[in-house]
Amino acid sequence: MAHKKGASSTRNGRDSNAQRLGVKRFGGQAVNAGEILVRQRGTHFHPGAGVGRGGDDTLFALQAGAVQFGTHRGRKVVNIVPVA
């Protein structure tokens, strides 16, 4: 086997771009319908009242209101509390 790989060959180039995951709107923040609340892989946060879940597990607001984080049956959930 060759101990040198040859012209125009490299052993580098394997660093991928960041996925920009995480919480995008924090507790108490006012949001409008359609705003992204959490970008995630898997369901680290589950959708609660007024929150929908996309095909890539992104959580988004279904209605306008304030973001509320909490737990339900041991799971972290995100709710939207309508502003009265």
UniProtKB/Swiss-Prot annotation:
Molecular function via GO: structural constituent of ribosome
Pfam families reported in the protein's UniProt record: Ribosomal_L27 (PF01016)
Stretch list, region Disordered: 1-22
InterPro entries the record matches: Ribosomal_bL27, Ribosomal_bL27_CS
Keywords: Ribonucleoprotein, Ribosomal protein
Protein origin, superkingdom: Bacteria
CC per GO annotation: cytosolic large ribosomal subunit
PROSITE patterns referenced in this protein's UniProt entry, alphabetically: RIBOSOMAL_L27
GO process terms (BP): translation
Keyword Ribosomal protein appears in the UniProt entry: yes
Keyword Ribosomal protein: yes
Gene3D superfamilies given in the database record: 2.40.50.100
Skewed-composition ranges (Polar residues): 7-19
Family in the record: Belongs to the bacterial ribosomal protein bL27 family.
HAMAP family: Ribosomal_bL27
UniProt-recorded name of the protein: Large ribosomal subunit protein bL27
Lineage: Bacteria, Bacillati, Actinomycetota, Actinomycetes, Kitasatosporales
Name of the coding gene: rpmA
